Amino acid sequence: MDKSVRVFKLRTQTEEQLVGELGKLQTELSQLRIAKIAGGTANKLGRIGIVRKAIAKYLTIINEKRRQAVKDQFKGKSLKPLDIRVKKTRAIRRKLTKKQREAVLVKTQKKLNNFGLRKFALKA
């Protein structure tokens, strides 16, 4: 394994390749932890943090790819899973829609139609 994993290179790999590499990293991490208990060298102990970060990067890319696949699956559909929907504030989610804002009661419509706005003229 490289000393550090570059994320832009991971994005070009397929999910199967990523999962395979992830398995190798996880076995390496378990071996390093065993070496730590057995009293391993300092460079092995320092490598634990690097491997953990590499595992996190692989998992992040795998999850991004899976989420993107689900987004593509639900693209253009009216109902989407909650975690795929656009994140908005609670207040914005509860705001009235344009149709609801423009809705007028029948009684109000009749008033407006039958009794137009009054025009007032001021005497000079």
UniProtKB/Swiss-Prot annotation:
Pfam families: Ribosomal_L29. The keyword RNA-binding does not apply. The keyword Ribosomal protein applies. Keywords: Ribonucleoprotein, Ribosomal protein. One of its GO terms (molecular function) is mRNA binding. Belongs to the universal ribosomal protein uL29 family. This is Large ribosomal subunit protein uL29. It comes from Tetrahymena thermophila (strain SB210). The lineage of its organism: Eukaryota, Sar, Alveolata, Ciliophora, Intramacronucleata.
